[in-house]
Amino acid sequence: MKRSGLVLILSILLVYVFLLGPLVIISFSAFNESEFLDFPPKVYSFRWFFRIFESEMFVSAFQTSLFVSLLGATGALLVGLPAAYSLSRTRAKWRRAVLSLFMSPVIVPGVVLGFALLKHIVITLEIEILTGMAMGHMLIMIPYVIRVIVSSLSNVPIEIEEAAVSLGCSNTRAFLMVVIPNIRSGILAACLLAFITSLNDVPVTIFLTGPGVTTLPIQMLSYVEYYFDPTVSALSVLLMLLTVTIMIVIESTMGLSFFTKK
């Protein structure tokens, strides 16, 4: 084997160890019987998983996360679907500029976006925290929704839509009856990806929490400031399983290669 090939293999192995090593440690720690983060565990137990569901603060935080993620995903889809359709069907010079504008929430640091929402929406406009949080999550979801749906629409020839219109369909009916059925998998993948992004968000959400209103990642962050037991490790395992499950669904519906298409 050439020296360069050996170096490449070792580099890849180091990257995998660096990325997956902490996840392996956390996963094993979640099944620890002890109240301390021992690795490897001396005795295995599901004790900390049961404790999660017995804890009102974690259950309440998950319910808030679920509500905000679903509401934000719905709003992002209502904005992103027509925007993606318009961008995919136009060849105007301003197309790239508008697409870049919709991608700006990804470019702007989350802490900047979160602080801006706190100052100008929650404080200045006196909008309640939960609504402001949902708006913030909708903003960070929109780029993912647009990106996925634009990629999905690139596989739908405009000719079939024009044929439907020539046969008597209105533009709206052609969109609903011809275009939407052909991009159902793309819409599903966009919503799931947006949901994952929202569920795991910390930088934006940390500025928008308040008394009785906090999401699961923020609650986990607050918990580890005072406690050092494996409860958060167990929660991390559950979140990883949820994320992996959703990514498998996305892969089975569209394929993850859609996210790399231009």
Region annotations inferred by a language model:
Residues M1-S11, W94, V150-E161, V165, ...:
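C-terminal transmembrane helix and the adjacent membrane-cytosol boundary/short C-terminal tail
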Residues Y16-L23, I146-I149, P157, N171-N200:
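Transmembrane alpha-helices
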Residues M1-G5, L70-F102, F115-V122, F175, ...:
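Transmembrane-helix boundary motif in ABC transporter permease subunits
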